[in-house]
Amino acid sequence: KNAEGQSFEMVWDGQIYDLDLWVIPKGSKNKEAALDFVAFSTATEQLAAQASWISYGPARASSEARIGTFHSDDSINMADHMPTAAANFGNALQNDFEFWADNADQLNERFNAWLSK
């Protein structure tokens, strides 16, 4: 059972992951503040700290070793619950944005037709 006494857990097998990024537009008025934010929000320690609240895999491999326990229960090792943990990432698929850009409309039509049956 999990921390709430429920008999279920997150399963990451077959997950689809995607990549994100931060952008500072050329000519930004607050460039220094934006750079400070990006440095803070992508820092190894910050990403590891975020993982104590929610099982989002940190964007930096350097954060993995620093992931601690769940913020309200020291008996739960959050590293085991990350989608990026070695045991959870073996069958992960990277989202193929080109495929979806080319096929989303057709597949959505087919899916909606199937749903309406």
Residue spans of the language-model regions?
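Conserved C-terminal helix/tail region of periplasmic/extracytoplasmic solute-binding proteins
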Residues: T84-K117
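Alpha-helical structural elements
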Residues: S7, Y17, A48-A51, N95, ...
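Mature extracytoplasmic/periplasmic domains
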Residues: I16, D20, P25-N91
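Ligand-binding pocket segment of bilobal, Venus flytrap-like solute-binding proteins
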Residues: K1-D13, V23
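Residue-level detector of alpha-helix boundaries and kinks
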Residues: E9, W22, A92-D96
